[in-house]
Amino acid sequence: MKNRWLLPEGISDLLPDAAQDLEGLRRALLDTYRRHGFELVLPPLVEYLDSLLIGSGGDLDLKTFKLVDQLSGQSLGVRADITPQVSRIDAHLLQQRDINRLCYAASVLRTRPSGQEGSREPIQIGAEVYGHAGIEADIEVIDLLLQSLALAELGPVRLDINHLGLASLLLAELEGVDEEVVLQLLQARDLPSLRELLAPWSQQPAAAALLALPECFGPAESAMARARTVLAPWPQATPHLDALDAVLGSLRLARHAGQVSLAIDLADVQGFRYHTGLGFAAYVEGHARAVGRGGRYDGIGAAFGRGRPATGFSLDLRELVELRRDRHTPPAIIVAPWSDDPALLAFIDTLRAQGETVLQLLPGQDAQRLAGVSADRTIGFIHGQWRLAGKES
């Protein structure tokens, strides 16, 4: 007999503990974004395919589930990333504004997981700034990313920063090189294969510089010094390096000292076809993949009639909850007996209004068999009144 309870690979349920943890974190993050002036938007799950794939290169196309609209016959896609949708909202629906700060939290669906054990249905949360080309907008979203990870309580964070314009200007000098393969080998830090691929251009300084990019990795000060040495022959690299220095020297990010270490990684070219400037990735101890990514994607709304500067970040709430699962403690609740006594119901309402969780047992339900909760107090009828028992109230 077919196991009807099985789910597709990379798709999973969230059971009560994890779902409660995720929802609590989602609310805390969105409240934080709101207090920073970011407005919540909720794009639809499905859109016309050409809208979903705007400015994304081929990566997002491969990740997108496609279907045919039974009403119009047009090709639709289930969103694999929310940023193109938010850029459409900024460009078309909120075009009367100057600078937009927008945030979101919703599920996406992907044909393939992002990692070996990753989910194909991440619950993506993020924040984006549209309409400001200065480094200040990048610093604002990086600061908000670090605050988000602090709220998630994942421990110390390493933030790797890059500027995709550096690899771009080197690749532009190597006529005929297979850029996609170069980018893959850079990301994998496969120097032997990269050296072999670049052998026909071995006499060109740009090839040597590309091979040196993986060495421009590590603690910010030493990695930046190495980067300036490697890229010294290219004056056009100076503004990009200065932008990296501006982020590293930001007083706003300095307040995270002790919990965040800043690093440079010029070989991290993930999102090369998507990002147009600064890129960044956040890592936590014991987890190989980045837990948060972001960067600049200027002009993403051009296809919607309004190409603007844009920068932002995203996180996967499922992944954050999985990483903090060992920190989860069952919610403390108050157990009340089943009764229609108005005095008991009024007492329960008062406790709930104060933020307490009160579970009223159904007839015949055994309080000793409550799963997934910590019943640290009970309500009993004591000396003619309904009172809390089991803990000093």
List PLM regions with ranges.
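TRNA-binding/sensing appendages of the translation machinery
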Residues: 1-84, 139, 160
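Positively charged, Gly/Ser-enriched RNA/tRNA-binding surfaces
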Residues: 18-36, 48, 83-96, 102-154, ...
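A structural signal for short, well-ordered beta-strand segments and their strand-loop junctions
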Residues: 40-43, 104, 158-162, 263-264
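Beta-rich nucleic-acid/ligand-interaction surfaces
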Residues: 45-61, 162-172, 268-277, 368-372
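Acidic, His- and aromatic-enriched active-site or binding-groove loops in soluble protein domains
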Residues: 63-70, 176-198, 203-206
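Short, basic, helix/turn surface patches
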Residues: 66-78, 187, 382-393
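Cap/lid and interdomain-hinge subdomains that line or gate substrate/regulatory clefts
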Residues: 133, 137-138, 160, 167, ...
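Extended alpha-helical scaffolds
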Residues: 152-159, 164-168, 177-179
